[in-house]
């Protein structure tokens, strides 16, 4: 009976042999002048069809509309400054600040903007939150075990800023804790 290592090694040998066969077939095909000529002919035919199609098409109108300048970036907010980007990178490297407060470390975070995305300095006010603290409600059985695991953005009837603040800390208190953990002077 083969061990797992032997099976893995056998599988690797089969893969290597298959790869070498495929490479040999490809080299053989590329060396065949008949195949190469057929590929060149296929390319020429495609170009001829494309040119004929362009000639059949009516000419474009002479007037061109000028590009309309986009006035709003929508929900994207404004571009962060270099300092805001530095702070956001430092905060993004932290674990979820709300989980950390309860002794749990969640390294997969998204940054939650406390003060919108367009105000001056708004990108300095971001909290590193896990998905359950940011905008998705944890499953009911998980919330039974961890009642403080509610999202800051309400997900249906679960969560919201008020409930989040009651079960954790205020966003500004969490921001101060995050700045302290990241050694950011504010």
UniProtKB/Swiss-Prot annotation:
Residues 62-76 have a biased composition (Basic residues). Pfam families: RecA_dep_nuc. Residues 45-81 are annotated as: Disordered. Transmembrane segments: none annotated. One of its GO terms (molecular function) is enzyme activator activity. Residues 45-59 have a biased composition (Basic and acidic residues). Keywords: DNA excision, DNA recombination. Disulfide bonds: none annotated. Stimulates microhomologous recombination. Enhances the recA-dependent precise excision of an IS1 element inserted within the E.coli galT gene. This is Recombination enhancement function protein. It comes from Escherichia phage P1. The gene is ref.
């Amino acid at each position: 009976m083969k061990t797992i290592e032997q099976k893995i090694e056998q599988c690797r040998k089969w893969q290597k042999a298959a790869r070498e066969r495929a490479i040999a077939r490809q080299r053989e095909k590329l060396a065949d002048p008949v195949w190469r000529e057929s590929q060149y002919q296929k390319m020429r035919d495609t170009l001829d069809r494309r040119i004929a199609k362009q000639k059949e098409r009516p000419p474009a109108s002479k007037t061109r509309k000028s590009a309309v300048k986009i006035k709003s970036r929508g929900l994207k907010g404004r571009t962060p400054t270099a300092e805001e980007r530095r702070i956001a990178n430092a905060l993004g490297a932290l674990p979820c600040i709300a989980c950390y407060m309860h002794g749990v470390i969640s390294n997969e975070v998204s940054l939650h903007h406390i003060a919108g995305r367009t105000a001056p300095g708004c990108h300095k006010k971001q909290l590193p939150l896990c998905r359950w603290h940011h905008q998705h409600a944890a499953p009911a059985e998980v919330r039974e075990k961890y009642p403080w695991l509610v999202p800051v953005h309400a997900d249906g009837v679960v969560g919201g800023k008020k409930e989040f603040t009651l079960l954790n800390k205020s966003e500004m208190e969490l921001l101060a804790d995050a700045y302290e953990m990241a050694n950011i002077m504010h």
